[in-house]
């Protein structure tokens, strides 16, 4: 058999590491797919299947999508349950000696997708990790778009099914015992559109799990996190973090706090009751309109909409917490003027949770920074209004709300009010912010004068 061309050999070597993914292989201004990936992707994406010389007698099946419009195609693959590995050129072609080096920089899966084009801003995109043992299961969930990260232990299969229904994750990873459990996996995949996959056994090695948790959360032991008596949660949390590191190729600094909760703190609602009550979607067509959430949702921000949805999906049962929430509601109802003022200030606030994530991951564009700055500007006014309410929740809110004045002042002094979307277009920083930048800008515009 004839040998593959050097480029095709490189493709095969990369693909070998990501057998469960569609490989987007960067060539110039396109992401190209070959062999079985090309056949599959061309059908799903409804694009032309062609061929490419690969060094063998038969041409390799090939299809491709433009680099600048890849999100549209990538999202369609994700919506159809595929994982996509993004393989980029990792060296300057002008400096390359021979074939340009390429490597996978990120794997996009249903539970790790951060595309603004596909995600509902009012709904969390959860990735769930489950470690099931004989008597207990550990459940860990994360929304990498917001940094929300939590874990619990569950004592029965029925309660585990209820927890899955409560979060309705986009993706679940689990061990063999979970995948062999008496759960309705077909319903999860077909009706709930949950992608489910097996986690490699080495992900559940105790020392590896404890090490990755300690490094991610900045602690020396599990006791400091409250996990010393929760081995199942250590396994599910450690496996989840390993999966994120393997797919995102990033330190994920914004995932830095783990919330440990008990399912006994909330009302347990089985899947049938949850559907029949139409809490967040209607029974017939699965739309928000007509559900309890649709009736109650008068929120002004995407963050508030997600929080309200979570409140509805997991009702409180602790009397003190219920009364604290009711006291806050009563205070709002009794002071319509202040309530309406707060709503006016909330209305223009952008999705700060997801903006902070993009900034942390260095995927934000200059206009994201302006959106973040304009939201920060409103925090002192909201905090002043919150101080008017004398209830437990509002007092805690006042104490916890950091105005981040120093960050606002930094953005105000540095970024132009109407910057471009793309960093490479320039014109991001204000004149006078940094002398070195001013010198370079002057050299660009007044170069002839210099000469």
Explain the meaning of each model-derived region.
Residues 1-331, 344-360, 364-451:
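Charged catalytic and DNA/RNA-contacting regions of genome-maintenance
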Residues 334-338:
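Conserved interaction-surface patches within small, structured recognition/assembly domains
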């Amino acid at each position: 058999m004839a040998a593959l061309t050097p480029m095709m050999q490189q493709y095969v070597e990369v693909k070998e590491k990501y057998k469960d993914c569609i490989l987007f292989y960067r060539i110039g201004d396109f992401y190209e797919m070959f062999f079985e990936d090309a056949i599959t992707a061309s059908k799903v994406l409804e694009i032309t299947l062609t061929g490419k010389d690969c060094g063998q007698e038969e041409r390799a099946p090939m299809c491709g999508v433009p680099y600048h419009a890849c999100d549209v195609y990538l999202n369609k693959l994700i919506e159809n349950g595929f994982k996509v590995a993004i393989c980029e050129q990792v060296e300057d072609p002008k400096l390359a000696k021979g074939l340009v080096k390429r490597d996978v920089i990120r794997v996009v899966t249903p539970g790790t997708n951060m595309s603004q084009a596909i995600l509902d801003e009012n709904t969390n995109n959860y990735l769930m990790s489950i470690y099931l043992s004989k008597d207990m299961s550990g459940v860990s969930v994360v929304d990498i778009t917001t940094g929300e990260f939590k874990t619990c232990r569950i004592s029965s299969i029925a309660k585990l099914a209820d927890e899955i229904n409560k979060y309705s994750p986009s993706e679940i990873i689990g061990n063999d015992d979970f995948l062999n459990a008496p759960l309705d996996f077909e319903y999860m995949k077909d009706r709930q559109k949950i992608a489910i996959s097996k986690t490699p056994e080495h992900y559940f090695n105790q020392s590896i799990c404890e090490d990755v948790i300690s490094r991610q959360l900045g602690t020396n032991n599990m006791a400091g996190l409250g996990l010393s008596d929760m081995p199942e949660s250590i396994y599910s949390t450690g496996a989840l973090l390993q999966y994120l590191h393997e797919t995102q190729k990033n330190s994920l600094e914004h995932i830095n706090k783990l919330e440990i909760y008990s399912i006994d703190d909330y009302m347990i609602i089985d899947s049938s009751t949850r559907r029949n009550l139409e809490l967040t979607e209607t029974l017939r067509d699965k739309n928000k309109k007509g559900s309890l959430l649709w009736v109650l949702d008068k929120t002004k921000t995407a963050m508030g909409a997600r929080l309200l949805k979570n409140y509805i999906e997991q009702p409180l049962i602790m009397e003190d917490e219920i009364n604290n929430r009711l006291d806050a509601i009563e205070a709002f109802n009794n002071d319509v003027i202040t309530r309406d003022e707060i709503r006016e200030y909330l209305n223009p606030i952008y999705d700060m949770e997801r903006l902070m994530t993009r900034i942390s991951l260095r995927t934000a564009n200059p206009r994201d920074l302006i959106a973040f700055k304009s939201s920060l500007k409103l925090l002192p006014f909201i905090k002043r209004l919150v101080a008017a309410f004398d209830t437990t929740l509002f007092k805690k809110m006042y104490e916890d709300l950091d105005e981040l004045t120093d960050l606002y002042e930094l953005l105000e002094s540095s970024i132009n009010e109407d910057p471009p979307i793309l960093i490479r277009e320039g014109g991001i920083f204000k004149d006078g912010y940094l002398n070195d930048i001013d010198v370079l800008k002057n050299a660009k515009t007044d170069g002839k004068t210099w000469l």
